C-alpha cells in the first residue's frame, strides 16, 4: 500500500474549508470539492462587496445632502462649491449626518455657501 505523505496537511486544509462553508446548503457544506468552490466564490464576492459598500455609502450621503440642500434653496453642486470657496472643510459623511440630526446647523452652512457664491 502506498504511503500517505500529506495526510495532516490535507486534513487541516479540508477542515478549514469545511468550517468556512458552514451554513451553506447541501453538498456545499459537506463535501470538500463543492465546498472549496463555493467558499472561494464567497470570499471573492465578500472582497467585491467591501469595495461596493464604499461607493454605495458615498451615493447615499450625496443624495441626503442634495435633498437637504434643495430644502434650503440651493443645489448640491452649488452647495459644495460654495463651502469649498468659503474654506469650510466638512466631509460628505458629516454633512449628511448634519442634514438629518441638526437641520438648523446645515441651514447655516447652506447660507454660508450661498453668501460666498453671491
UniProtKB/Swiss-Prot annotation:
A GO CC term assigned to this protein in UniProt: ribosome
GO molecular function: rRNA binding; structural constituent of ribosome
Record flagged with keyword Transcription regulation: no
UniProt keyword list: Ribonucleoprotein, Ribosomal protein, RNA-binding, rRNA-binding
Alphabetized InterPro entries for the sequence: Ribosomal_bL20, RIBOSOMAL_L20_CS, Ribosomal_protein_bL20_C
GO biological process, any: translation
CDD domains: Ribosomal_L20
Function of the protein: Binds directly to 23S ribosomal RNA and is necessary for the in vitro assembly process of the 50S ribosomal subunit. It is not involved in the protein synthesizing functions of that subunit.
Protein name: Large ribosomal subunit protein bL20
Organism, scientific name: Clostridioides difficile (strain 630)
Gene assigned in the entry: rplT
Amino acid at each position: 500500500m502506498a504511503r500517505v505523505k500529506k495526510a495532516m496537511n490535507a486534513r487541516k486544509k479540508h477542515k478549514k474549508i469545511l468550517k468556512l462553508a458552514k451554513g451553506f446548503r447541501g453538498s456545499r457544506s459537506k463535501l470538500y470539492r463543492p465546498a472549496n468552490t463555493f467558499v472561494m466564490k464567497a470570499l471573492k464576492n465578500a472582497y467585491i462587496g467591501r469595495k461596493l459598500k464604499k461607493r454605495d455609502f458615498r451615493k447615499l450621503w450625496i443624495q441626503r445632502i442634495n435633498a437637504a440642500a434643495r430644502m434650503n434653496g440651493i443645489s448640491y453642486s452649488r452647495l459644495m462649491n460654495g463651502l469649498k470657496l468659503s474654506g469650510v472643510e466638512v466631509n460628505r459623511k458629516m454633512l449628511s449626518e448634519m442634514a438629518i440630526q441638526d437641520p438648523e446647523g446645515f441651514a447655516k452652512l447652506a447660507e454660508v455657501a450661498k453668501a460666498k457664491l453671491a
